[in-house]
Amino acid sequence: MRLMKLALAGVCALGLLSAGAANSAEPVKIRMAWVAPVANWASIILEKKDLALHMGKSYTLESARYQGTPQMITAIANNELEVSNLAYSSLAIAIENAGLDDVRVIADEFQDGVPGYYSSQFYVRKDSGINKVEDLKGKVVGTNGGGSAIDVAIRAMLHKHGLEEKRDYTMLEGPLPAMPAMLLEKKVDLIPAVLPFSFNPKLREEGRVLFEQREALGLTQMIMLTARKSFIDKNRAAMVDFTEDMLRIVHWYLDPKNHDEAAQIASKITKAPPERFGWLFTKADTYRDPDLMPNLEALQRNVDTTRELGFVKKQIDIKKYADLTLIQEAAKRLK
């Protein structure tokens, strides 16, 4: 009997030690990418970390800025980035050209061209003499990087009008925040003006919209949150916690009653006056699904366009590269 009690005590002690080890496990480190301030969730998510109930417990979160989504691909391949906000184009490039066939779409970030919502604008100078797309022949076009979503949209629109890069126009790369200055200083003749830079007062005064992205691509699943399957499988519980916190914070930002505070946060991030952000999280903004559910049908069309423009060669069935179970499980917790 005494031996049995000792054995039971040993089993209990081992159980307590195991539980203690589990409870003391280090939180999973999540590095999350962004390109455009305010437009990308990672640039503002930590401003409302008080709503992230699991942050610091099951996971930690760091945000990292990149010039464009193509630059994230190397970081993903080197395991330097756990959650990336890839565009439809860079997703296709990552899958085929970089061999990242375990990358998975896990959530929506924003969509372009949804009826009634904002679509990215492409500006020329008012004094440029450029009145139609065909007038861009022989001109210099600004881009934030070959193969980015914006880059593909430009190429698609110019292709529709019979213009091809190198043969008919030249591309010049630069960061998105610098685009208005590049146009007004006559370094380029056309720029992509994404939010929030399209509301630059000087750009609006001296430039004009030549076309919108919806004219080139229709409805676009512009940016998605992605992660590698190997990372999801290894850290599923932490990823569901992260996604739950994301949903909670996104709901806060999208609630109209929080608009003024959201504008103050945007002002802090961009160093621009808060009154410039009246459009933020309204129909003057790009569409953001409140449940973070991506539009996979639109994404398939967008990936097909990327292939048609020569960035990838093979047909990609995008549903094979989506894992929406994280967002679905997280959403159930909030009901």
Over which residues does each language-model region extend?
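Secondary-structure end/capping motifs
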Residues: D233-K313
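Bacterial N-terminal signal peptides
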Residues: A7-S18
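Positively charged n-region of N-terminal signal peptides that target proteins for export
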Residues: M1-L6
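Sec/Tat signal peptide C-region and signal peptidase I cleavage site
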Residues: S18-S24
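Short, glycine-/small- and polar/acidic-enriched structural segments
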Residues: A25-E164, T170-E173, D189-L195, L219
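Conserved C-terminal helix/tail region of periplasmic/extracytoplasmic solute-binding proteins
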Residues: V303-K335
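Pocket-lining segment of extracytoplasmic ligand-binding domains
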Residues: S89, P177-K268
